[in-house]
């Protein structure tokens, strides 16, 4: 039997070489780098028997080991980092520890450095909102006024269209976005869905639908997503099989983040506050009150909170550790 298998293998090899020679040299074609305007739509596959665990790479400098953090301080000190913004909105943390700030009124992106300096990065945008860094260090910007995503190369200082979203409603356009370590997560605000867009903008997959106005997303250390549903007055947990679970009710939640210990921080426009759901108890505690139209919220490199107090035109640091 073995010698017959050997003769068959040799014959197949000769046939393959003759065919390959007749066809000429094989030259692979590189995939296009520009996002398709008619992207591939991949359906959500729900599998009740699924047992595998989704474990993407964590975003840069956003998930912190619990062993390195002091206990959560529920009476935190608040530090004003910068003032005199027009309408600061969303935030993203860069790998060097600097914070990037979008200003929807000014149409700008600014950088707040660890040394406390403000640098203008971009201007002339149409109501910029959420931002996310790709692994190559370039920046994706959600432009609410045009309901599209833009790509900015910080080295060449080149701004190009990345992905055009669809809005056939009278609702405001896209708000927050997130890089989850593998793809862009886009709460499709006007349409009440959550989208997953590939790093090159070539494919898009709908992860969830039926939300009122999703505006913020965060990757938990478990690999699930937290979604702030602003007009739905709730925060949901989105599992990778498409299931949605309500985490809590809030008054106009605009953004949400969570630490590695499982504490969930929600910024709310309805009562101008930061709420925290204490890990293991689901107890809702008002961490900060008396704000004015709070918007973006992220962690800094030390695990403390950075937030925009938009109505007071300032950037704040909340010392929770």
What role is predicted for each listed range?
Residues 23-77:
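Ser/Thr-rich, Proline-interspersed low-complexity disordered segments
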Residues 61-101, 106, 315-321:
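An edge-strand/N-cap motif at the start of beta-rich repeat modules
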Residues 77-83, 117-122, 158-168, 202-208, ...:
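A short beta-strand motif characteristic of beta-propeller blades
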Residues 83-96, 124-138, 167-183, 210-224, ...:
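Beta-rich, blade/repeat-based domains predominating
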Residues 84, 99-105, 141-147, 186-190, ...:
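Conserved beta-strand positions in repeat-built beta-propeller and related beta-rich domains
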Residues 107-109, 147-150, 192-194, 233-235, ...:
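Structural signal for beta-propeller blades
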Residues 112-117, 153-157, 197-202, 238-243, ...:
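Short loop/turn segments that connect beta-strands within beta-propeller blades
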Residues 293-321:
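Blade-level signature of beta-propeller repeat domains, shared across WD40, Kelch, NHL, RCC1
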